[in-house]
A protein has these predicted regions:
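RNA pseudouridine synthases
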Residues: 1-117
Length: 117
């Protein structure tokens, strides 16, 4: 879990935030009071924005999600223009999600595909 709900920011500029999502933390939740990456990052933006806009919540768009049990990097857009461009890149192979699994034990095959429905 996130210690004291401080996000681990990997990269941030005026348009995007790339952060590490720990296992167990949802990317986004519709339940009031649930700590998720969206609310954690919005709090980060409120605390660290140079021009304090107290009357307006910061813009933050989820570009892709990771399941709650999964940890990894998430990309968020800080502007509508960045959200549009990143969404376009995601659908046209500009960038994507890659998974790495760690497994224990002795396996019959060195390679394979795991499908979980």
């Amino acid at each position: 879990m996130i210690s004291s709900l401080t996000p681990e920011i990997i990269y941030e500029d005026k348009d995007i935030i790339v952060c590490h999502k720990p296992a167990g933390v949802p990317t986004q939740s519709n339940r009031i009071g649930t700590k998720d990456m969206v609310s954690i990052l919005k709090n980060h933006l409120i605390k660290n924005t140079a021009k304090k806009t107290a009357s307006r919540e910061p813009y933050l768009a989820v570009i892709h999600r990771l399941d709650q049990p999964v940890e990894g990097l998430l990309v968020f857009a800080k502007t509508p223009a960045a959200a549009k461009e990143l969404s376009r890149q995601l659908t046209t192979s500009g960038f994507g999600k890659y998974y790495r699994a760690q497994a224990l034990g002795i396996f019959e095959h060195n390679e394979g595909t795991l499908e979980d429905y």
